[in-house]
Each structure stands twice: as C-alpha cells, then as structure tokens.
Amino acid sequence: MKSTPLALAGLILMAVLVCVSTSQADIVAYWSFDEGSGDAAEDGSENGNDGTVFGAEWVDGKFGKVLEFDANYVLVPNDESYNFTQDQDFSIILWINYEARGDWQGVLQKFNGGYPFKVEVNPSNSLYCAIWDQTNNPGAHVGNVSGDWHHFAFVRDRSEKKIYSYLDGQLQETKDDTINGTTENAADLYIGARKPGNTILFYGTLDEIAIYNRVLTEAEILSAVQGNIPDVSLAVSPRSCLGTTWGGIKIQYY
C-alpha cells in the first residue's frame, strides 16, 4: 500500500507524541549526577527540575559520577510536579551510601509544615521516608544500612492506603497510609538537607535519584536495582521512539 509523504509524516508525528507522552508522564524528576563537574544537577525528565549544587563534590560512585555530601546540599526550586497532594500516588528511588552519625540527616526533603515526602536518616541511623499532614505522619523504614551502597525505594499506593519501603529491591515494611489532610507546601526541594536554613544535613553519597507520580511495581524496583531506571530512557531522549515507530509504519505502508 502506498501513501503520500504528508500522510506518513502525520502518522510518524502522532506515534512519536503518543510514545513520548506515555513514557514521560510518570517520571517527574531524575537526577543521574553524571555531569561530573560544575554547580548544576540537571533533571533528566521533561519537567526541568534542575538543581543548584552548593558545596557537594563530584566523585566516582555507584554508576559513573555521584555527589558526595559533607554538610552540603543541592537546591531544586519548588515545582508542582512533585508537590504531591494528600490523595496522590508516588514513588521515590535512589542509591545511597551514608555515615552512621547518630543524628538526623536530611536526604531528600520538601519540608515546611505538612510535607508530601521526606527521605531521612534518624538518630538510630535508620533510613526511611515519611509523609506529614501536620497531624498524621506515616513512614516506612529499612533499618541501619550505613557504610555501603544500597538501593532505597519508597512507594505510596493511595488506593490501597498503604506505603512501602524497599531495600535493594526487597520489601522491608508495609504501613498504613493515615494521611487525611493537606501535604502540599511551597518549600523548595533539598537534596542533602532538610529545609531553608540548611539544617539537618547529610553525610554520604547519593546517585540515581528519581521521583514518580505513580506506584512503581516490585518488578520495576528490581529493574532499577539492576541499573534500568523506569521511564528514563525515553524521558531523556524522546527520539529513541522514532526507530521503532518508523519501522512499524514501513511494514504497514510499504
């Protein structure tokens, strides 16, 4: 079957737009820290959630370059893409290697009154993530895993009213999601600190941080542990759809 060049162009455009929208809609921020130098931590999603590095050092790490924190931080301006509401699903994944200091350490936080999430190390050196509506504060831990690289994942499934924590791809805790009030705030996002004023600082290294506006499956989390970050390949380069798209169109029309 033959078709006009204009019709073919339209088909290609529609297919690529569908591919891009389905691959990019779910990942709202992704920091690979592969820049290796400079004061910018670029967001690999389409949302432009780039961060500014304040003092953290670029070093070799788990996958290529990583950021090492010694009472330093990255500031990401507030954005609605990760300012999750009280009824919104979301997931967070990251690689972490931290020091056991017997004190609070802010890892990834949007903290100001109620908050949609905070990843933190507590004084027992346990890594966890929590949500707060200024009354209820559900959180899920993975224990003291300091001193070596580990993959941490936190998942909120609002339909099930559950939150989950994973360590190296394995489920650690399942807790009730008791949130019933506002979690949104106007705070910026800090990587390596808690909040404005740069209190509750982090000591360690971080890599491959990704935030999603949906529930990640256990299979996807295991894939991330193996280095395959869900949704990232197409979010970073929408053109990667094009080869498959064009191949399918050629089969159909020629």
Where are these regions (language model features)?
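Extracytoplasmic low-complexity segments
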Residues: 2-72, 173, 222-254
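Extracellular glycan-recognition modules
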Residues: 28, 32, 37-41, 70-128, ...
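Short, flexible loop/turn segments at beta-strand junctions in immunoglobulin-like
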Residues: 142-144
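Residue-level structural signal for beta-strand termini and adjacent loop
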Residues: 177-178
